[in-house]
Amino acid sequence: MKLTALKCPSCGGPIELDEKDENVGYCQYCHTKYYLESEQPKVFIEYKPEAFRNSMATKKESGSKAAAAAGAVIGVIGLLALILVPLSGTSKNSSRYPDRDMTAAAAASGEQSREESKVPVTYSSSFEVLIKEALGMSISSVTEEELGRFKYLAMRKGEAGWLITYSFENPAEAAEQGQDADIHVVVCQEALKVQDIAALQKLEYLNLDHTELPEGSLETLESLKMITCDYIQLDMLRLALGSRAQNLERLNASHLKSLEELSGFPGLKALEMEDCRDIADISALAQVKDLERLKLCDMDEVNDFTVLNVLKKLKSLTIDAENLKDISFINHMPELAHLEITDSRILLLDPLLGKESLKELALVDNSEVRDYAPVGTLAGLETLVLNKYTSQDDPDLTALAGLKHGEFHGMMGIRFLGSLTGLEELKVQGCNVDQPSVIASLPLLKKLVYRKNWGNSDDLSFLAGCQGLTYLDMNHSEFYGDVSYAFNLPALETLILDSSSFEINFDRLQDNPALKALSLNRVKLYKNIEMWSDGMVRSINYDNVLLDENTEFLAHYPSLEYLSLRENQLTDLQFAAGLKNLRELDVADNYVTDTHVLDQLEYLGKGSSVKRPVADVDWIDTAGDFH
């Protein structure tokens, strides 16, 4: 006895039997595979929505004999203990991962009823891949404890498919402790489903993009503290989290249209909003007065920022908004330690005067500022990013003796650096280099970015005095001078000269076992440089040099683990034979045809103790991000 109108419990689609195996069925809509347990009689059930079944139960017990027969069939079903489950989950695994199966314990004991029956939770093929890659097991054998290892999950569409990023650590918390979390990526053809995410109940940080979230769909995530989302509105997010919204501590959201539902997240300590151009009113921020970190980027429709006066617990504030005209609200923030103002219309920096709590300050592209002098009164600063690019006088920064990280753009001179003897990291870009030797006078300097400067910027001899440098980046720059001083620095581990032109005096080069990472992508080499000026125009003569004809100089650096030489018209890789420690070599977009020499390098492609160097770009990186 059987009912042949079988429907998929997940989507309601018809299930058809496999012609070769009558114990297996496939949903014609979602393609889920099911089987009928062989120990029991073969009975097929047509699953119907609960409301439909209840309405049927209330009908009068009158009808044809056919209706009575159908009722008898249902009675038989209650006794026969049918188990209908997806193929990858069997009854013996239901105790390990019950939500994966059709949970038929009630049927087996004769207690199955309309109220107790459960629709099966089916998981996507991408989730199967994720579990296999991350845990080395199938979804049918994984336990809740093992699923609880996932702390971070992100999902976005890439060229190769969906990139599922995961970690067994919380990367945001690791970053706060100065550590890097181990993050892994799995490429899948489809996005994860909401029910997949809901199974990872111990997630702490979730990153979603363009995802539809049904009500209550994330309520199982009992440990969730941080969410990054794009094109997901606050009302949908609040309903999806249910009671868990109360516990959310950090929210990074892009493309929001309204802040009206912000009160649904009373536990927020950190809020970041980016590219929310539809929002003109931010008064709802008053509903989250316990905020400690706030970031408002691309909020160009906002004109009124007075609500910030009530956020008295803020420790970090970042604003990128072209209608911001005043920053007096910082006077109401006694614990403010990090402040970043970008692309504003502020005229006066007077509220900064003597702001003792500030440790980090970034002022970028605020072209209407009349006077930067208040910056010089912040004696407690440890990090300063000053993007000036105006003809106004540079501020007197001699009082900032505690500064450890400095980025200076568009300054009229750099002599002031001589008083900042505590600097450990320095970026000088677009500045008038009136006294290059002052950089060599910084005794603690470890990291230097030196790009696109003018004045005496071609004189690179000052580098010889930077004996403590471990990192040097001079990418995207034109130097009519000799950079061999950089190659000889005894402590230098990373050197980046991408997309730059310069001279290398190869005769001056010395063996340097400290250098482990070198990037020379798209370089232009000179020699015999001659320059003269008539006071108005500078003339330059030089001879071109081919890197392909001078690669033997790389033998001076036997400890190299990372080497990148993209787009240099290279025809030969013989230079690599002596670089026995190479882990990674990038020679793309060259003219190399014979790569047999690489077979001699036993470590190539086997991981490196040195991070791949990333060249500095024009955008300002500051210490305030809480991603």
Give short role names for the model-derived ranges.
Residues 93-136:
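N-terminal, intrinsically disordered, polar/charged segments of Gram-positive cell-envelope systems
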